[in-house]
């Protein structure tokens, strides 16, 4: 018999809770190293990946389920539309999002786990162990939990926020933003956190008005259904088209498999045009000339 949304959600919550313990355990002895693409990997990344893969081992015996794990060396082989269309449930795990921050013992890192159904965002869980903050979507509603997994935890339902853009508003960008873009900051300002799940989850509760990124599926899969319940969507910077499901053609296949091809602007429909007007592409420069 197929599990219910609540069954899957409880499993996901258990996984991120245990993963949080692992992240805290290795925070001061993370043994950071570099991957081939020069991104950082730590002992916690490896241990959390192993933990979650073990927790899902029985589920993954069903060919209807597929796990996309940032630390899986075979992940590129899954980027095939015909295979994806045969996958009813696509799990996407980022063991430590904000790994560079984690490796420097900073608290802004999270554990992200998303479950897509028929390639559309469905369930999502994002946990910030040091902050003791949890965001999750149960398929119907999304919630923000303070003092998560504690006896005094406080759960708040996430709803669309009707905030007017002003001088106090913050818009989040990734750490490579200024390599290609500039920002007209007359009305409101940008902030760079170097952590995708911070950029995606915080605006869902009014900490910022949106974000700009080009990342991999595991970076945003957990946050995706959560932010949609807050009225925020992934929109193409080029066309403004909303991304509402996964398709292989949206992602790079070679240098960085599963990274989005296009930059995305995450915001409410109301704010999209105003925020986009603040971003402009700068001419490519040869830094050696």
Regions found by a protein language model. Name each.
Residues 1-96, 284-289:
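N-terminal subdomain of lithium-sensitive/metallo-dependent phosphomonoesterases centered on the IMPase/IPPase/PAP
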């Amino acid at each position: 018999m197929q599990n219910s949304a609540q069954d899957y959600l409880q499993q996901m919550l258990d996984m991120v809770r245990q993963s949080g313990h692992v992240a805290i355990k290795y925070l001061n002895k993370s043994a950071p190293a570099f991957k081939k693409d020069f991104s950082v990997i730590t002992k916690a990344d490896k241990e959390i990946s192993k933990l979650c893969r073990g927790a899902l081992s029985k589920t993954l015996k069903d060919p209807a389920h597929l796990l996309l794990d940032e630390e899986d060396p075979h992940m590129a082989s899954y980027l095939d539309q015909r295979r994806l269309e045969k996958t009813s449930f696509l799990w996407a795990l980022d063991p430590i999002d904000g790994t560079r921050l984690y490796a420097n013992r900073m608290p802004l890192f999270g554990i992200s786990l998303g479950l897509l159904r028929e390639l559309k965002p469905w369930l999502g869980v994002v946990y910030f162990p040091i902050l003791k903050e949890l965001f999750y979507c149960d398929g119907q509603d999304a919630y923000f939990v303070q003092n998560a997994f504690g006896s005094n935890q406080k759960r708040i339902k996430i709803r669309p926020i009707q905030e007017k853009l002003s001088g106090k508003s913050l818009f989040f960008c990734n750490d490579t933003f200024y390599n290609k873009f500039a920002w007209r900051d007359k009305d409101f300002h940008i902030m760079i956190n170097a952590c995708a799940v911070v950029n995606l989850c915080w605006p869902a509760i009014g900490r910022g008005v949106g974000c700009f990124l080009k990342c991999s599926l595991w970076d945003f899969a957990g946050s995706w259904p959560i932010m949609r319940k807050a009225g925020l969507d992934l929109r193409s910077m080029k066309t403004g088209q909303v991304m509402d499901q996964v398709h292989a053609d949206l992602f790079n296949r070679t240098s960085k498999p599963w990274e989005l091809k296009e930059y995305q602007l995450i915001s409410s429909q109301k704010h999209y045009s105003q925020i986009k007007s603040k971003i402009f592409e700068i001419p490519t420069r040869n830094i050696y000339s």
